[in-house]
Amino acid sequence: AMAKQLYDYWFVQFDFPNEDGKPYKSSGSAMVWNEELKREIPQGWSNMSIGDYAPCKSGYAFKSKDFGGKGLPVIKIGNIQENYTLDMTDSQCIDLFNKTLFLAKRYDLVIAMTGATIGKFAISQSNYWVNQRVGRFDLGDRPLSRLGFLFNSLKQEYFREQVFQIACGCAQPNISAEQIDSISILKPNDVILNQFNKLCEPLLELQSENYLQIEELTKQRDELLPLLMNGQVSVNSDLSHG
């Protein structure tokens, strides 16, 4: 929530600190009209396509015979949740697959490219393979250092509208990696962009740690519940030995 507030303040209201440390737009600094984004933006800023910042790569068409219980879990469109997380509870795994182009690392961003979930995206909290109809944004070797700006840019209503506009021409809503790449987003100057990404890093890290902790506790609960219900363990004895 803090990162979103900061994004709105800097990149929607344009009140990032200017050279004198004052809020840019509120203190009367120059704004210019940007035709592509259909709004006024700070002088010296521009627009860029998503592909310029982090190209989207399509997932791999795994065959059902390849799925098993071992290896890395595979992200399918159904795993992408409304709250920007992945629910990998019932995921299937792929073993002995070496195509790193289709690997989502921790802090990578993945997006649903078809069906009712189109345009939904999530932060990957571990290493996963990416299935077809899921896209992965290539944020480079240290995704966390560039994640903040892209993650919050995609949260803007404008991005979802663009996705629907492109996708709704088909019977089955569908968007390609190239079409996602072509969507325009704001291009701040490098100083402000890097500053924002740096401020987001600890917030996203904390969010990730909390997510992994909840996932671990949920797993423990699901393992313990059946044992408690059929009397194989009792709460008191197990807690006193903890």
Explain the meaning of each model-derived region.
Residues K76-I77, C93-F159, F164-A171, I175-E178:
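A short beta-sheet element
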Residues L72, F121, G140-R142, G148-K155, ...:
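Extended non-membrane alpha-helical scaffolds
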Residues A1-L6, Y24-Y60, S182, L186, ...:
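Non-catalytic DNA-recognition/assembly elements of restriction-modification systems
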Residues M31-L37, M48-S64, P73, G78-R106, ...:
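Sequence-specific dsDNA recognition surfaces
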Residues G21, K63-K70, F164-A167:
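Short coil/turn segments at secondary-structure boundaries
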Residues Q81, A116, N189:
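Flexible, active-site-proximal loop/turn residues at the rims of small-molecule/cofactor binding pockets
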Residues Q5-K25:
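Alpha-helical scaffold segments that mediate packing/assembly in large oligomeric complexes
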Residues A1, F149, A171, S234-H241:
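Extreme N-terminal leader/activation tails
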